[in-house]
Amino acid sequence: MNWRFVELLYFLFIWGRISVQPSHQEPAGTDQHVSKEFDWLISDRGPFHHSRSYLSFVERHRQGFTTRYKIYREFARWKVRNTAIERRDLVRHPVPLMPEFQRSIRLLGRRPTTQQFIDTIIKKYGTHLLISATLGGEEALTMYMDKSRLDRKSGNATQSVEALHQLASSYFVDRDGTMRRLHEIQISTGAIKVTETRTGPLGCNSYDNLDSVSSVLLQSTESKLHLQGLQIIFPQYLQEKFVQSALSYIMCNGEGEYLCQNSQCRCQCAEEFPQCNCPITDIQIMEYTLANMAKSWAEAYKDLENSDEFKSFMKRLPSNHFLTIGSIHQHWGNDWDLQNRYKLLQSATEAQRQKIQRTARKLFGLSVRCRHNPNHQLPRERTIQQWLARVQSLLYCNENGFWGTFLESQRSCVCHGSTTLCQRPIPCVIGGNNSCAMCSLANISLCGSCNKGYKLYRGRCEPQNVDSERSEQFISFETDLDFQDLELKYLLQKMDSRLYVHTTFISNEIRLDTFFDPRWRKRMSLTLKSNKNRMDFIHMVIGMSMRICQMRNSSLDPMFFVYVNPFSGSHSEGWNMPFGEFGYPRWEKIRLQNSQCYNWTLLLGNRWKTFFETVHIYLRSRTRLPTLLRNETGQGPVDLSDPSKRQFYIKISDVQVFGYSLRFNADLLRSAVQQVNQSYTQGGQFYSSSSVMLLLLDIRDRINRLAPPVAPGKPQLDLFSCMLKHRLKLTNSEIIRVNHALDLYNTEILKQSDQMTAKLC
């Protein structure tokens, strides 16, 4: 060996991590990857990532060839050692260094910076020197395989890989035949890439013809390379700084200082490289990979919807009636072909989810010290409930080329794209009780027939209640005075006599057409006394009117509280009109022309009309009283001569209730109630008096429908019981028995839910 060769061996340096290959002349199938522990440090840094073998592997991996298989053999020729470094006494016997290298050390000075070390020494000479090695050559065959393509071509990827292994093992026996067969497989399937490698004396006649020095160094387990850090040939005062500079160059790519503290190592970036800790290229690749995985996730769901199993399932679903989520779930569970296809989807999405999680963890680990914060959200798995809702949307919200989402609670579609053309005709609901027995053939949205106990009315099933004409024999709910609201408002303004209800005015505190002081509560009542005078009628109130006159420059604002007794009784058995609440109307105040009088009108209309027997009106006033008048009493005659007091006085010249009377047959209704009462006490069957039960249920429903409004969530007032008590003179026990009998018939025979009511009387 000449001096040039020995000198080259002395200063041969290795730039990165050395991957030890499998045992001599044994095949090796490995998945190349970077150590997870140092992902954020060595990713895209150092010469290792620019080496020929690593770049070749990365390129193949991006093309889908995820598995590498290599078979090789080595030929050792010479064993070389660095005898100069093996000397222990470097002071007496210094290492024979090249003049250029010695000059570079002298240029460093005694306190060099990291950048000086990198530019002067490391970039030129590297970080390690060779202690001992074996010179020789290598002959290798490398195959990159895509198992997914092999699986599609042959049906079994495991058997295909084993067959390729057996074929490659004959490479050193029949090189030409093996390569010819492998090239045929490569061209026909596209699932493998084959590469031959020959280095060292096998491929070259002399050292001068070699492409690189490393091609003659054997790196197997039998022929190990022994390296030593370059700091051993530096003076002692430069050794620590060299190690720090070498680590900064390898781990930080020369863009910062490599620092370790509390078992945590990082790069302290220089000002011109603020992102040295951030492998932006790898982060972009991972973000792109995650985006593709999310697309694959969505495509997996689309593949199921486009599969033959799913399409056949949709065709087998019945279309002659409405399908709820529960009924679709039942059909879903009974379709075995669809279940097997759905299990394949679940296993595929689970594997995809694990890949996404691993990639996301790597992404967030790499971006720990980056200014760039990755924004990634794991795709949500579609639950079985969402699949059933999707089926429902495909059934009813997929029309005219538009699509939408079906809401079962509202039985309607929310169309996408600001249109309402996606909804198909929603079929009727088939079931028990008031559901349809069959949908109409002419219009599938309407009922064609009903269950027993129900009748078909305008495409809907309603209980077979008694005819309205029969109910009219007991109470004449329908009269000639059932005007529309606009007509009622016009008649009230004209004070039409047809709407007058003649009542008796009662008050111990107020006289009509007489001024009084309203600063304290005043009470007045309007009653009919139907129990004595008009026993064959019950009465309906649709409005009220009062004419109130005030003194000039008066600051009073009257305020009314109105209580209504529907069928007589004490004051506690009345209810308060909730003015302005729950949609209830307010008083309307209109001033009369050339007068200090106002017409106060309350129009209930058809929506809020109700029964009444007595109306109690409490009058108060809202005003700011002077300090001297706050402690005065309001009793006694008024003094109109005192100008400081008369501005508070008002008078009521007229109070009128508007409505009409309904004919009421108390004897006939009492006999029907007694029949139900006797049947209940004797334990008789309900069907023996079903017509009477239906009649009383209809009357109770129509009476309670006229109850006053209540707050949301609170039960409605029971006016029917008040009528039984005050107009039919039933006892409390009889009222309870009648209501209980009606409730039992309604729930057990008609299968309808009872409406909760609150006791008033």
UniProtKB/Swiss-Prot annotation:
One cellular component term from this protein's GO annotations in UniProt: glutamatergic synapse
Misc note: Silenced by methylation in 50% of bladder cancer cell lines.
InterPro entries: BRINP (IPR033237), MACPF (IPR020864)
Subcellular location field: Cytoplasm
Function: Plays a role in neurogenesis and brain development. May suppress cell cycle progression in postmitotic neurons by inhibiting G1/S transition.
Protein name according to UniProt: BMP/retinoic acid-inducible neural-specific protein 1
One Pfam family in the UniProt entry: BRINP
Organism: Homo sapiens (Human)
Signal peptide residues on this chain, from the entry's feature table: 1-19
Tissues showing expression: Highly expressed in brain. Weakly expressed in heart, lung, skeletal muscle, kidney, thymus, prostate, testis and small intestine.
Keywords: Cell cycle, Cytoplasm, Glycoprotein, Growth arrest, Neurogenesis, Signal
Protein family according to the UniProt entry: Belongs to the BRINP family.
Domain MACPF: 68-251
Residues linked to a glycan: N156, N433, N443, N553, N599, N631, N677
One Gene Ontology biological process: vocalization behavior
